[in-house]
């Protein structure tokens, strides 16, 4: 089974839509971060979370636990969010949570254990929430304003620009893999 969480009016072939807004006519009316996802444990192969996670406030950790619960081992979570240093993020008052590669890494038990060993710090969410997501790929989408400027820059130069200026990247795309013990 494949699900599209918080998809609004956007539909994808083969995906069930979950949304809190009845006007979007979702397959399942669900308040993400508050309601349990209406699926059995280990029943979902893929989750699309396009421009929704940044809208989830206090229920964010509950939502991550619910996604983990319903997903099968090796399920893919496909995430797209506004980049945390873009006006796209800041321009919408309903964007209340930064979603970054660094903060999503905190949902990895492997990373949590490494962090404990390296720094004697239990910083992370994978172990205390009993979830395990590994980032398998990510990409920062260059804002249109910067595309032509980046054409002749080296990777090092691009990274330097992105460290020093806002609005270089418009979106962050990443894929997580659900890791469950056999």
Regions found by a protein language model. Name each.
Residues 57-62, 66, 72, 76-182:
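S-adenosyl-L-methionine-dependent methyltransferase catalytic module, highlighting the catalytic core
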Residues 2-83:
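Conserved SAM-binding loop
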């Amino acid at each position: 089974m494949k699900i599209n969480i918080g998809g609004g009016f956007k539909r994808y072939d083969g995906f069930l839509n979950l949304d809190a807004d009845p006007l979007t006519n979702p397959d399942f009316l669900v308040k993400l971060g508050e309601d349990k996802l209406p699926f059995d444990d280990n029943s979902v192969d893929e989750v699309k979370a396009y421009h929704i996670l940044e809208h989830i406030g206090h229920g964010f950790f509950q939502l991550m636990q619910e996604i983990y619960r319903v997903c099968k081992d090796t399920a893919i979570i496909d995430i797209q969010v506004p980049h945390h240093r873009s006006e796209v993020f800041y321009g919408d008052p309903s964007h209340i949570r930064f979603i970054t590669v660094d903060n999503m890494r905190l949902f990895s038990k492997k990373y949590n254990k490494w962090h404990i060993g390296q720094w004697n710090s239990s910083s992370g969410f994978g172990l205390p929430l009993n979830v395990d997501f590994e980032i398998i790929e990510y990409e920062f989408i260059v804002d249109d304003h910067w595309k032509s400027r980046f054409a002749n820059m080296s990777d090092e130069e691009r990274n330097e620009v992105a460290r020093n200026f806002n609005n270089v990247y418009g979106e962050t795309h990443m894929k997580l893999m659900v890791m469950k013990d056999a």
